[in-house]
Amino acid sequence: MAKKNRLNTTQRKTLRQKEDEYIENLKTKIDEYDPKITKAKFFKDLPISDPTLKGLRESSFIKLTEIQADSIPVSLQGHDVLAAAKTGSGKTLAFLVPVIEKLYREKWTEFDGLGALIISPTRELAMQIYEVLTKIGSHTSFSAGLVIGGKDVKFELERISRINILIGTPGRILQHLDQAVGLNTSNLQMLVLDEADRCLDMGFKKTLDAIVSTLSPSRQTLLFSATQSQSVADLARLSLTDYKTVGTHDVMDGSVNKEASTPETLQQFYIEVPLADKLDILFSFIKSHLKCKMIVFLSSSKQVHFVYETFRKMQPGISLMHLHGRQKQRARTETLDKFNRAQQVCLFATDVVARGIDFPAVDWVVQVDCPEDVDTYIHRVGRCARYGKKGKSLIMLTPQEQEAFLKRLNARKIEPGKLNIKQSKKKSIKPQLQSLLFKDPELKYLGQKAFISYVRSIYVQKDKQVFKFDELPTEEFAYSLGLPGAPKIKMKGMKTIEQAKERKNAPRQLAFLSKANEDGEVIEDKSKQPRTKYDKMFERKNQTILSEHYLNITKAQAQEDEDDDFISVKRKDHEINEAELPALTLPTSRRAQKKALSKKASLASKGNASKLIFDDEGEAHPVYELEDEEEFHKRGDAEVQKTEFLTKESAVMADIDNIDKQVAKEKKQEKKRKRLEAMRREMEAAMEEEISGDEEEGKTVAYLGTGNLSDDMSDGDMPDSEGHLKKKARTVDYSHGHNPSNSVDDDIIEVEEPQTLEDLESLTAKLIQG
């Protein structure tokens, strides 16, 4: 291959000057641009660089949305932005374009370190932002990185120092800020918080505060979300300086956006459904919309898992998928890819995909469980009707939830229409669920966990006017899930639940370092650490139907009149305290070690083994015990004892001798029986050979007896050698002039069966004489 033509020094200098002039001209256009006077409709109308425009054009981003036209010019001018817009309005491009342009104007390289930090509440949203960034920034030289949970931390640590644009979730970003040596945020240019209110709702407030405190105060900050809340306003006070609000009125002033936050092309409906009939209605809805692409939202991952497993076994006629936060990252990514490519599919999901995720061509969004607030409702229904396309949403409200929640929707200018259920389309699946749960204990366990998670979700809701815990029909709801009854539930306080949420989202490394002493050393509890792989195997807890949680759920209530004898004993103080054990150390000398480890030497030092027997009282005695002389004389005279002992032992020996004789006799008879059986088989084989040979030569054979050897021979008459066997059968030769073929009667010689040896000799002589 020919070498590429390299630019000389003069040419490179000229190229740099042109680039500097282009960037200065671009900055001038940005400063002169007034969005109030000039309302841009296309990306090319904005003062952005050619590489960015080329990437946008290749990705088919031509026309600006309302939020993009309002926020991008303000962000390009360097202002902090607090933005809110409808779902599906293009908020991702609204902050990615300013990020790329900021670094381009600053001539950012990989040696300058981290230039922009983008924080997303969920892994799926972070992955989507990263994919969009790689498309529109394909003609720039910036390096981008994605850091989320479920990925290899060491792999990320090795490369994070060379990244210019970092995208990730709050927990993993804070972990890298604590651990990564080469990650320097002192020169950070931009910070972007996507779905900021969701980050706060998920318990990331302390994590976000810790991240913001480590960043440069001279940075530019962008906060984006489809909804704004008071918590976002509080975060804006801490993170933003002299910020501009785009697409929303200031929440801190108490004003409310009069325009509805849902897309205009979205058709919204609701139905009033009793809690016990929700699964019946859901299954009937899926059966009647087999040609659609839909997302079904439930309140917890346990419910998603249960509904997916049961509906999958009932086969509604459409592809089913499920996605929730407890899945592995690889499974979540594969599910998202399959759902995006499919055209007719139903996805059961939690709120982990309710925000920001761009699902193409979703026809229906079904909310089986009532969302916690109107903002969550807006984000859920925003998964369809994106970018001006049509879509439909349906929410199922119980009679207890309907009135209060509809008032909250109407206050936000959202007025869904009411739908009536056709009884002909409704199908009850309660018998099928009961049959499935009866056959499969694991499904029953999933149903119990789904019941508990739903009841707890209602208990922890803040809006008690919508979620009335005391009016829940628990028995009917348990029956609708296929359960025989409502499981026991232990409720925790709200403070405990908030603390558990914070512990769940807290970085594990920080929790580990919190156990360090004054010297910074972490002393681990060795008693809780498995020593070998076998210890790990035995200490591993079962997560299926045999788990401890399952046993606690299914434990029957103890009867009050139960007998006191039936007591369940719990073992206590079973852990061995190492301080109480003696010091077991090997000797220092090699000879002593060899002697201690040698089995032969250790046995020699222990002496001879002794055999013990135990009496009825459980006391041990040697097999042979010697009596004292006094005890011996107490039983009588020595000669008398000797005579009694000999008589007793003689009787015992006589009985044993009789048994031995009987055993010997049986063995002898068995041996003789086997020998006779072998002789019979040999005689029969020999006779068959002689018969076949004589028939071939045309000779007549005379048989003695009945013709059956087993009937003719008895045990007493059986000879002992093979020589006598051949004398039992005789071959008669008629070659002396008598032709056996002349008559049939001539071939038969009738004789009486010989009884003695003399009879046999007489018969032989007669046969010889003819």
Curated annotation (Swiss-Prot):
EC number assigned by the record: 3.6.4.13
Ranges of residues in domain Helicase C-terminal: 278-437
One GO process term, biological-process aspect: rRNA processing
Annotated localization: Nucleus, Nucleolus
MF GO annotations: ATP binding; ATP hydrolysis activity; ATP-dependent activity, acting on RNA; identical protein binding; RNA binding; RNA helicase activity
InterPro entries hit by this protein: DEAD/DEAH_box_helicase_dom (IPR011545), Helicase_ATP-bd (IPR014001), Helicase_C-like (IPR001650), P-loop_NTPase (IPR027417), RNA-helicase_DEAD-box_CS (IPR000629), RNA_helicase_DEAD_Q_motif (IPR014014), SPB4-like_CTE (IPR025313)
Residues annotated as binding ATP: A85, K86, T87, G88, S89, G90, K91, T92
Subunit (UniProt): Interacts with the U3 and U14 snoRNAs. Associates with pre-ribosomal complexes.
Domain notes for this protein: The Q motif is unique to and characteristic of the DEAD box family of RNA helicases and controls ATP binding and hydrolysis.
Role noted for this protein: ATP-dependent RNA helicase required for ribosome biogenesis. Involved in the release of U14 snoRNA in pre-ribosomal complexes. Required for pre-rRNA cleavage at site A2.
Protein name stated in the entry: ATP-dependent RNA helicase HCA4
Gene transcribed to yield this protein: HCA4
